[in-house]
Amino acid sequence: MSAIFPELPDSVSSEFVTVTEGVELRVLRAGSGDPVLFIPGWNYSAEVFVHQLTELAQHYEVLAVDPRGHGKSSKPLTGNNYPQRGSDLAALIEALGLKNLTLAGWSLGVLDALSYLRDHGHDRVAKLMLIDETPKMAADPGNPEEWGEVPLTHDGMPAFILFLSTDRDGFLSYISADALGVDPELADQDEATRRLIADGAQTPEHIAIIAGVEGFATDVSQTAIDFERSGKPVLFFAKEAWADDAKRWVSANLPSAQFATMPVHAGFMTEPAAFNARVREFIG
């Protein structure tokens, strides 16, 4: 049993919510109080937030969702795009009656969260957490005002797309190991990484490719800026490896946002106590 990625305890309940015809999303829930909704990143399920569903649930109602195509949610052939996933979130939040919500997106889950806010407003959302992803993944490495994960160069964006589209399994293995701070060459030797890979492998290949490539092309920066300008609190987490670049972008674009670092991309799994303490400080 991996301490980094353990099985869900019995205290976490699971339910399915219909968000549109033929599409159900699995939601994990624990605790009571003001709600906090976590959205996982590319391919992964709600189970990556096991430490939040156990520890933060002592203070709040903690929810985590499998987006369409992920985990145990429906895996339709169509609708696997961020605007639709934002609409799925709107239907989910309304169906569950969530208000005064802290909305938290991790990795490409940031795009789900911001797509929801862009298209459906933030009347139900009190606070926003953006966990280690820029709202605009593609960036010009020659422009110091830009910050992104995918360089807009001849061997940048195409390399990402080809790696993802021709070797999804290899891409998933690399991303999973990197998220946990494990050498990708040793991914099959690390228990937590193997479990994270298996979790992500529940997403069909066609959905994985669509979500990844569309993510590279999506820009919801203005939505993040507009939310911050509304006066509602924002907390931005960044992994230490790119924290300086992230903080520069956040300071310029989200000047009132709180900023925190974590050791690696999935620091909420590898160092949950520190992550959860910072979240509690933010939510209050």
PLM regions: where:
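Conserved HGGG/HGGXW glycine-rich cap/lid loop of the alpha/beta-hydrolase fold
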Residues: 6, 19-78
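Short beta-strand immediately N-terminal to the catalytic nucleophile in serine-hydrolase-like folds
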Residues: 103-105, 131
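Gly/Ala-rich beta-loop-alpha elbow adjacent to hydrolase catalytic centers
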Residues: 105-109, 113
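Conserved alpha/beta-hydrolase catalytic His-Asp/Glu region
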Residues: 139-147, 161-227
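Conserved serine/cysteine hydrolase catalytic core
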Residues: 201-253, 258-262
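Catalytic active-site module of serine/aspartate enzymes centered on a nucleophile-bearing elbow/loop
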Residues: 254-284
